[in-house]
Amino acid sequence: MNAVAPTIADRPIFVPGFFYARSDRVIAIMQPTFLPWAGYFHLIASSDTFVFLDTVQLEKQSWQTRNRILVNGTEHRVSVPLDRQTIGLPLQQAQTRPRQEWFGKMRQTLAQAYAFSPFLPHTLDCFDSAYSEGDLSLARMNAAFIAAICNLLDIATPHVHASTMKANGARSERLIAICQELNGETYLSPRGAADYLAEDGFDRLGGPALQFQDFTPAPYPQKRATGFVSHLSIIDVLCHLGPAETRAYIGATP
């Protein structure tokens, strides 16, 4: 018998978008990752401007190129193959392998994995719009998918690509420069960056106020899973909950 995970109503969800002080201008900055998890969209929804950090070096076997879904209740990794000549270049210059080598197979995997879901067409539309045509720029395709999901979830936060900005510098200096160029008063950071921000002395560099994202993904029912599998791609959340409940799940404010 499949274990039934608690529904959203069964336990509280941390919804920082509802209690962050928003009298100032909040900037969030992230690399354009591949089919990102729900927390990525919570970060976007909690900011006034979101920046795709596409000027960093592409790393092999990173979240820029891979993520996880459920297949028959079991965690399954999906990844996009890279043109080897672009590994190590800035992300905005990275290219995937020719689309015919991976797009059709990956789409079929998604379609079969979530064939049970009445929300699959909405999700595949987002995937198709980003990855089915156009150039092979990894950053462009990832950003296009993220923008399509934001549109589906009615998240209206404007997006900016760091590669179109003047800001530069290493690590924290670059983040501060981006915030300053956008007149940001608060930098909203994922908690996973806390160690390197502390190492860089972010709060002593004369930049914006630093605030950390507070998002804990609540369990939701997952078909055939024997227990809740957390931090999967937003695709899994959408296919199980649908757009309206996914919007509530990530704490997007009206």
Model-derived features: positions:
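Residues lining hydrophobic/aromatic ligand-binding pockets adjacent to catalytic sites
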Residues: 3, 19-254
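Compositionally biased, intrinsically disordered low-complexity segments enriched
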Residues: 14-15
